[in-house]
Swiss-Prot record:
Catalytic reaction list: 6-carboxyhexanoyl-[ACP] + L-alanine + H(+) = (8S)-8-amino-7-oxononanoate + holo-[ACP] + CO2
Enzyme Commission identifier(s): 2.3.1.47
Signal peptide extent: none
Binding of pyridoxal 5'-phosphate, residues: G104, Y105, S175, D200, E201, A202, H203, T232, L233, S234, K235
PROSITE patterns (UniProt xref): AA_TRANSFER_CLASS_2
GO biological process: biotin biosynthetic process
Family membership noted in the UniProt record: Belongs to the class-II pyridoxal-phosphate-dependent aminotransferase family. BioF subfamily.
Chain's role: Catalyzes the decarboxylative condensation of pimeloyl-[acyl-carrier protein] and L-alanine to produce 8-amino-7-oxononanoate (AON), [acyl-carrier protein], and carbon dioxide.
Protein name per the record: 8-amino-7-oxononanoate synthase
Subunit structure: Homodimer.
Annotated keywords: Acyltransferase, Biotin biosynthesis, Pyridoxal phosphate, Transferase
GO molecular function: 8-amino-7-oxononanoate synthase activity; pyridoxal phosphate binding
Organism: Mycobacterium sp. (strain KMS)
Cofactor: pyridoxal 5'-phosphate
């Protein structure tokens, strides 16, 4: 039987129609330079992506090292800039060492896959970030997905395993709703059962902990020998890239075994220079971390969300995807840019507006947010 004449991509139209009918079609929307909309959608938590010192850090790095890193860090892409920033970030977070990757996504892939593998067990929270989910899938380890924030289920998985090596992976702050992971309890369980804990601090760095050092710092686990921290440079630090922090033995192993590190071009100097400058601003101005949480509380109050947020994220669940998308568009039309999360990013029936507070929000910005959200949410909740 032949299938000559069949288009190998014809199925894409059918899938696109199904997504459109379910209200789940995505579209790219251009963000204008210097736009006037109040930004409650970006992850620029500390408002550092446009900070003069951060911009100058990027420019200075380009002038000294060039526009690109020119190769893998194992060939020509490793510079004094990369290693100096790694030392600075490790010192800031209390880790023994750090290794920079080209993105937070590849940092998670590299760490989880290289530290697990066949014959090991990975225990993952049901709501971990997609990069951790994909890392578990690629690891060839046995994977147990536990209910959200369920420490008892984690302990059961570890206690009943046959594998010698076991790793528990989690976000510190879950990105869709801003809820904190019970890191101290999770670490206690890991310690009892000889498991490694890998924590993605993408939404914790710059917001939680002393001066924004992260949730691991806040719960007393900074630099713990059985904890590996991953994070992005694209949120609180306003740049781009990712990093894995932990014991020196972990760094050495990743240089040998993490494929996203070995076979990827090193992070561009501009991104490293910007992230390093942002880190220096955070060290000089630790109050920025507190400002994020204070502004998140103001946004939660504007949305009638009863609890004070634990992070920069304020989640307003509206239910169906069409309702959430219409609300996000209505906000933008009134000068307020908000996030809109729909399945498969969040479970069916929980489509939502996702607001992210930033340290740089002004009183006028918050007044605009209160006015627009009151109008839009009243209509959306009818």
């Amino acid at each position: 039987m032949t299938r000559a004449g069949l288009s190998p991509l014809a199925w894409l139209d059918e899938v696109a129609d199904q997504r459109r009918a379910a209200g789940l079609r995505r579209a790219l929307r251009t963000r204008p330079a210097g736009g006037t909309a109040v930004d409650l959608a970006s992850n620029d938590y500390l408002g550092l992506s446009t900070h003069p010192r951060v911009v100058e850090g990027a420019v200075r790095a380009v002038r000294e090292w060039g526009a690109g890193s020119t190769g893998s860090r194992l060939v020509t892409g490793n510079t004094e800039l990369h290693e100096g920033f790694e030392r600075a970030l490790a010192a800031f977070t209390g880790a023994e060492s750090a290794l920079v990757f080209s993105s937070g996504y590849t940092a998670n892939l590299g760490a989880v896959v290289a530290l697990s593998g066949p014959g090991s067990l990975l225990v993952s929270d049901a709501l971990t970030h997609a990069s951790l989910v994909d890392a578990c899938r690629l690891s060839r380890a046995r994977v147990v997905v536990t209910p959200h924030r369920d420490v008892t289920a984690i302990e059961t998985a570890l206690a009943t395993r046959d594998e010698q090596r076991a790793i528990v992976v989690t976000d510190s702050v879950f990105s869709a709703d801003g809820v904190l992971a019970p890191l101290r309890d999770m670490h206690d369980v890991c310690r009892r059962h000889g498991a490694l804990l890998i924590v993605d601090e993408a939404h914790g760095l710059g917001v939680r902990g002393t001066g924004g050092r992260g949730l691991l710092d806040e719960v007393g686990l900074a630099g713990a020998p059985d904890v590996v921290m991953t994070t992005t440079l694209s949120k609180a630090l306003g740049s781009q890239g990712g990093v894995v922090l932990g014991p020196l033995a972990v760094r050495d192993h990743l240089i040998d075994a993490a494929r996203p590190f070995i076979f990827d071009t090193g992070l561009a100097p501009a991104a490293v220079g910007a992230a390093w400058a942002a880190l220096e601003v955070l060290v000089d101005e630790p109050s920025r971390a507190r400002a994020v949480l204070d502004n998140a509380a103001a946004l939660a109050q504007a949305c009638d969300v009863p609890a004070r947020p634990d992070s920069a994220v304020v989640s307003v669940i509206l239910g169906e995807p069409e309702v959430a998308l219409a609300a996000a568009i209505a906000c933008l039309e009134q000068g307020l840019r908000v996030g809109c999360f729909r399945p498969p990013t969040v479970p069916a029936g929980t489509s939502r507006l996702r607001l992210t507070a930033r340290a740089s929000l002004t009183d006028d910005d918050l007044d605009t947010a209160r006015r627009v959200l009151a109008d839009v949410l009243t209509a959306a909740r009818r």
